[in-house]
Regions:
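C-terminal and inter-domain tail/linker signature
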Residues: 2-142
């Protein structure tokens, strides 16, 4: 089960958005639940792969993605109606890990735009390791 807590943050002083519930629905690949977080005309952009999705296309991309997933929210920042959520995502067998940075802009408590950036976790490139610069942020990545 994902290591997430239910977390509501206020938007504009009165409307709540449950960002942790949204991330949990995505990790569980629960299309009905995912849909409940979006405005009907929401736009979703995956910038790393130059893809723009409708809500229904986003749900297909997530729910038909192979495997079972887990993850945990590492950081959340809120600026007015914009949530920046950084999530560590990994397959249930923990054979790999990824980081997703999600910029979630809400309107009336629903996601109006979602801009996501995905990266594979891994070793620095050889040329940088050979320079012997930097150090690990954490000792264990997965």
């Amino acid at each position: 089960m994902p290591k997430l807590v239910r977390a509501n943050l206020t938007i504009g002083g009165n409307t709540m958005f449950d960002y942790a519930g949204f991330i949990n629905a995505v990790l569980q690949q629960d299309g009905t639940e995912i849909h409940s977080y979006f405005a009907d005309d929401a736009v979703i952009n995956w910038h790393c792969t130059n893809e723009c999705f409708t809500v229904d296309e986003y749900i297909i991309a997530n729910c038909e993605y192979p495997g079972k997933w887990d993850g945990e929210i590492e950081t959340v920042h809120q600026i007015d109606n914009l949530f920046v959520v950084i999530t560590k995502v990994y397959p249930k067998d923990r054979s790999a890990s990824f980081h997703c940075v999600s910029f979630i802009r809400c309107l009336n408590g629903k996601i109006a735009t979602l801009d996501e950036y995905w990266a594979d976790d891994g070793e620095p490139p050889k040329w940088r390791r050979e320079m012997k610069i930097g150090k690990p942020i954490t000792e264990v990545r997965i």
